[in-house]
Amino acid sequence: MNPVLFLAAALAGGVGAVLRYLVDLGVARLAGRRFPWGILLVNLSGSFVLGVVTTALPDAAFLLGAGLLGGYTTFSTAMLDTVALWRDGERPASVFNAVGMLLLGLLAAGLGLAVGALL
């Protein structure tokens, strides 16, 4: 792999992580912290954009997909939030966070692939 591309992807991952933090913080300010709406939005939007990038910009898929979107999206935080909801007695919210994020993420990725194919 080209070392410059590798470095650019690493830097893009850092940018993605900062964007994730800002989106999560902004959504939490609007919606509160009872449910992790910010992380849900991050993962769904990231799934959609990755679908678009994969089909419409295949040459940029590593930089944008593994780099920017790899830093932006987060499975680990989503699962930690799911466990925290369960622990706090928010069983329906916990199940929705796990199952809903998976199903909605698949839908978002599929829509992204379809949109990317049209571009």
Q: Predicted regions: what is each one?
A:
Residues 1-119:
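Membrane-interface helix-loop junctions in multi-pass transporters/channels
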